[in-house]
């Protein structure tokens, strides 16, 4: 039995089995152009592999205003949508969404694999949030968009220190 909490506030108790989820984070039109041209293709391949392995596929959208003032929450045109499990966030950490946490616990998810953008912000914050909630977390490095590679080296070290698995 795992008691999970968010910021020292007990949210619930959940019996967890060894179920897995793939979190696809921020693969949106407004973000994806900043990264390698084949990032969506690699993400799509991982989505299909995860679907075949019976992972629960979950999409995370950032709905906060961009620095430019623009709000854009449309997925990238060529992103494969393998499920209708979509959760919105207005903070870097996807686990700031109680709805996401409740959904994952209702599905008895214990392990989370993350792919998406950006490795130094939303992926990092979401990985830390997931660990705080008691999930086993892994990040698939070839499916992570990173705009500042030197900084990402430090990010990877920080994530490994808290138990995040880098694949």
Where are these regions (language model features)?
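Active-site acidic carboxylates
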Residues: 2-91, 101-102, 106-107, 164-165
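Short beta->alpha junction loops
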Residues: 87-93, 142-145
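Short, well-ordered alpha-helical microsegments
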Residues: 96-97, 122-124
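Short acidic/polar active-site loop segments enriched in Thr and Asp
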Residues: 110
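A short glycine-rich beta-strand->turn/loop micro-motif centered on a GG-aromatic cluster
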Residues: 113-116, 135-149
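Short Gly/Thr/Asp-enriched flexible loops that form oxyanion-binding sites at enzyme active sites
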Residues: 123-133
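Active-site-proximal loop->helix
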Residues: 148-161
């Amino acid at each position: 039995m795992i008691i999970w909490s968010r910021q020292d506030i007990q949210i619930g108790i959940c019996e967890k089995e060894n179920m897995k989820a793939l979190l696809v984070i921020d693969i949106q039109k407004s973000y994806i152009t900043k990264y390698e041209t084949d990032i969506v293709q690699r993400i799509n391949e991982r989505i299909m592999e995860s679907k075949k392995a019976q992972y629960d596929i979950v999409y995370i959208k950032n709905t906060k205003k961009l620095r430019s003032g623009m709000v854009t929450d449309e997925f990238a045109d060529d992103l494969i949508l393998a499920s209708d499990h979509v959760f919105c966030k207005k903070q870097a950490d996807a686990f700031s969404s109680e709805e996401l946490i409740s959904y994952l616990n209702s599905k008895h998810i214990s392990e989370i694999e993350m792919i998406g953008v950006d490795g130094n912000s939303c992926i990092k914050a979401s990985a830390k949030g997931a660990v705080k909630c008691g999930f086993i977390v892994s990040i698939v490095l070839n499916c992570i968009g990173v705009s500042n590679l030197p900084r990402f080296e430090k990010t990877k070290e920080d994530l490994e220190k808290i138990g995040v698995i880098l694949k």
